[in-house]
């Protein structure tokens, strides 16, 4: 049993009715299970959430607590991100698949750089000032395979601009799925008269993860409810349709789990708060690291109480809605080294640098925000058709997918959604457990 996992970045519960009205995502909901109340993690940032999507763990276990490394001395736009798979401290679907002898592919999936578990790897990495985007991606990914794709589809891409980048990514994914069986290359000029099903599909990866960013880009640039965001969602539906068509054309739909998920929503930005500058100006022994619509406070343990008092005394002045204490952060299973965090009033974005560019919308809010309710479609022979799941957690997705395709994630903090699985694939579960 194969797995195709597609992430629709920055779509959320409020988008459900519109997305279900579109031809491909609507049809996919009819083929299997749909849920519009998938509780995401804290923080609501792309890299931590996408790591949870493939580990079933919270940041306190998988180790990815932010998109960027904490580098306060370096200006925004020049900081390193968590691009490398070695940053992840727990097993992923990719590592467990490799233990079970399966192949994986990842296309623009966060935190996959230099992964030894992914055979076909086009990682999401961003060129910093002075770097070349293509050369950097080749260094972090499967270079020769990426070069072949660039020769085939490079004309479709305009750097990292959307929607062309998503179009390129979907073409690469569909090409992987549609790779033709070529018996003459393996068995001689007369070919293999009766190839096995596995031989027929030997080039299609067992796990394929695809990250589509069009809607996230549109919302950051134009706003949460912009026409451009609505148009991006229509394009996302077309991309999902491309993948479904490739699976149907390969006659692999009935032997594949197709999962479409999201990571977080967004909310419009109405103003900014330079919290780190305020801390420095007022000699508060802490440094802020923006999450967007929230921030971490990096402090020494001995400074916890004075920093907490300084924040409480200035909540109204700073337009802070909520201060997350260390107890609340431990309950949310946020990174263990974060002892304090804040969430400002609705629409206030915390900035690390007063000169940085401010988007029209962003995320990074707490788990009680409406944008923290995400979406999930699950289709495959083990999932009942036309079924609504009332709610689940985003950390439940990876162990459920692993179980459905005969793998396991014994370190996952989420649970297997057994109530929506009829017959899981047993083939490699025991082998993976023993690996």
Language-model segments: which ranges?
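Long, internal low-complexity/basic segments
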Residues: 391, 402, 414-435
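Active-site metal-binding loops of divalent metal-dependent hydrolases
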Residues: 9-10, 262-265, 346
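Active-site neighborhoods of enzymes that stabilize oxyanions during catalysis
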Residues: 288-400, 428
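His/Asp/Glu-rich, glycine-adjacent segments
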Residues: 57-223, 316, 351
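Active-site-proximal segments of metal-dependent phosphoesterases and phosphodiesterases across multiple
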Residues: 222-237
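Anion (oxyanion) recognition and catalysis
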Residues: 29, 98-99, 252
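Metal-dependent active-site segment of extracytoplasmic phospho-/sulfohydrolases and closely related
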Residues: 4-5, 24, 235-275, 401
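Short, structured active-site-proximal loop/turn typified by the sulfatase FGly-forming signature C/S-X-P-X-R
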Residues: 16-61, 105
